Regions:
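Serine/threonine-rich low-complexity intrinsically disordered regions
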Residues: 5-7, 29-30, 36, 49, ...
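Low-complexity intrinsically disordered segments
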Residues: 39-42, 50-96
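N-terminal leader/targeting helix
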Residues: 1-2, 65
Length: 96
């Protein structure tokens, strides 16, 4: 997969999570929950910036094996964090 495709996949998943967070924030009644959701949204934005930056700057640029391992680890990092954000959003939904 190309860097461009990976970036698009990251952005699509992050937008889905961010949209869900906006909806949850809109229907939540308490200001405390809204503040927690805004913190989660901040975490999502930091994750997005970090991930997009990491996509374009692989380590071991001239060694194909290192690049392949770098992107394998990066994909694992992305999937792990997206799953974590999704679980945190699910916890907010259960709290409504």
């Amino acid at each position: 997969a190309s860097q461009r495709t990976l970036k698009k996949e990251i952005i699509a998943e992050v937008m889905r999570l961010f949209d869900e967070a906006l909806i949850i924030r809109a229907v939540s009644g308490s200001e405390a929950m809204q503040a927690k959701i805004e913190d989660l949204m901040d975490d999502i934005m930091v994750f997005t910036d970090d991930s997009l930056r990491r996509v374009t700057h692989p380590s071991g640029k001239h060694n194909p094996q290192l690049v392949k391992a770098y992107y394998r680890d990066l994909r694992h990092y992305i999937i792990t964090n997206l799953t974590s954000f999704s679980e945190r959003l699910d916890d907010f939904v259960e709290g409504l």
